[in-house]
Amino acid sequence: MKIKTRFSPSPTGLLHMGGVRTALYSWLFARKNNGSFILRIEDTDKNRVKNNSVQDILYGLRYLQLNWDEGPFFQSNRINIYKNIILFMLKKGIAYKCYCSKNRLDKLRKNQILNKKKPKYDNKCRNKNFFLKKSNIPYVIRFKNPTKGLVEFRDMIRGKISISNKELDDLVIQRSNGMPTYNFCVVVDDWQMNITHIIRGEDHIHNTPRQINLLSSLNAYIPQYAHTSMILDKKRKKLSKRCSSYSIINYINNGFIPEAILNYALQLGWSYKNQEIFSINEMKNIFNIKYINKSPSIIDKKKFLWFNHYYLNNISFNLKYKYFFSYCKKNNIFFDKDVNISGVIKDFLGRHSTFKDFIQTYDYFYKEINISNIKNIYLYNKLINITILKFLYKKFNLLNNWDLKNILLIIKESILYFKISFKEIAILIRIVITGKKQTPSISSIIFYIGKKKFLLRIKNFLKYLQLNNSNFSK
């Protein structure tokens, strides 16, 4: 049988690192075994579906290049399929209508808890012939779960799991509003889509015995299951779809690249010898479910940043360039054609852990400087500074060959002419063209920012000083 895995998120919030890891493991397992990877969107609970969640899921998977072979399938488009199977189950006597009111079920649950019993349905309607009954009284449809025996399966991570059918009640498979329930839709989809292996979080493990019983009642193939441990935040709490901090969209917006996200997600509960860095091909070749551990993993921001920093320094320049401009386009960041952004990337990106940090540090390459916001701007309002800036403007304006060598020559000439230190002239130029006291090599900044922008910023700075103080201090 051909291997088929699936990733089936519910669009009820943000796709976080737990979902990314599940998708990655399922994708890797399929790729390693020459199988298929299916994307399915479980959107039957319309009251919980969040706007843009589907788009965020698709965007995140595409960004990570976790390409799917089939889908995306939407459960909301398959409602009639589920209802027809429920009708079949009613006719076969493996499902039944339950007319118990919410009030009765609440009282039943309350009494069971008071008597220290496990809350479960008492099967009041199980053996009543309500199939042909026509009534205005609301009802749900329940699956006739076996009342004897055990449900046994071998989890690929946790080993043999066994649970008595006495612990399980008759699962609701259709709500009173006519909508099939999550647990039922999942079973039908896994059956009809020929899913062979299901990798998902351990929070689904309690659903597995019920789903196996449903599949058995339909004479369907029982997939193999692997339930991964939870991923926790820094407070050791389960990741939430409502928390944007750990969402894939947040990491993308902060400038994390696919290789780093995948490499970090891979090792949240998985390890192979002492190796930390894996290419995508290595992941596909090495990945094995037996290397997944049972203990929960904790998001480590420093480690995540380390991975991103590593890849920003080690991927090819062309790929780095592609990712960078994709990030800039998404954030409406554009550079003048005179700015040598390739040089900026080559020389300075490696110092940073994310594109966001990088772009904020060197914002003066694409943003105009608000001179009035420069701290202690009045300190530069001196005649000597004005004279130096006019001298620099004249010299650089005449420069035809814009390269580092000639830029340094003009700076040295200015130092000798005005009898000042390199530090003094460098600070002045930095303030004028970047608005900051600290930058990398000033000659590199001048070179990369380009002649046009460099001269314009000197001109604007001089104009600002003249407008704000016509009598320059000595």
Swiss-Prot record:
Gene3D superfamilies recorded for this chain? 1.10.10.350, HUPs
Output the SUPFAM superfamilies linked to this UniProt entry.
An anticodon-binding domain of class I aminoacyl-tRNA synthetases (SSF48163), Nucleotidylyl transferase (SSF52374)
Q: Where in the cell is it found?
A: Cytoplasm
Primary residence: cytoplasm
Q: Where is this motif: 'HIGH' region?
A: 9-19
Q: Where does ATP bind?
A: K241
Q: The motif 'KMSKS' region: which residues?
A: 238-242
What is the catalytic activity of this protein? tRNA(Glu) + L-glutamate + ATP = L-glutamyl-tRNA(Glu) + AMP + diphosphate
Top-level taxon of origin = Bacteria
Sorted UniProt keywords: Aminoacyl-tRNA synthetase, ATP-binding, Cytoplasm, Ligase, Nucleotide-binding, Protein biosynthesis
**One GO cellular component, as annotated:** cytosol
Q: Where are the transmembrane segments?
A: none
Q: What class of enzyme is it?
A: ligase
Supply the EC number(s).
Answer: 6.1.1.17
- One GO BP: glutamyl-tRNA aminoacylation
Keyword Protein biosynthesis listed: yes
- What CDD domains does this protein map onto? GluRS_core
Q: Which Pfam families match?
A: Anticodon_2, tRNA-synt_1c
Does the record carry Cytoplasm as a key word?
A: yes
In alphabetical order, the GO MF annotations are: ATP binding; glutamate-tRNA ligase activity; tRNA binding; zinc ion binding
- Its job: Catalyzes the attachment of glutamate to tRNA(Glu) in a two-step reaction: glutamate is first activated by ATP to form Glu-AMP and then transferred to the acceptor end of tRNA(Glu).
HAMAP family for this protein: Glu_tRNA_synth_type1 (MF_00022)
Q: How does it assemble?
A: Monomer.
Query: What does the sequence similarity comment in the record state about its family?
Result: Belongs to the class-I aminoacyl-tRNA synthetase family. Glutamate--tRNA ligase type 1 subfamily.
Q: What is this protein called?
A: Glutamate--tRNA ligase
Please spell out the taxonomic lineage of the organism that makes this protein: Bacteria, Pseudomonadati, Pseudomonadota, Gammaproteobacteria, Enterobacterales
**Gene that produces this protein:** gltX
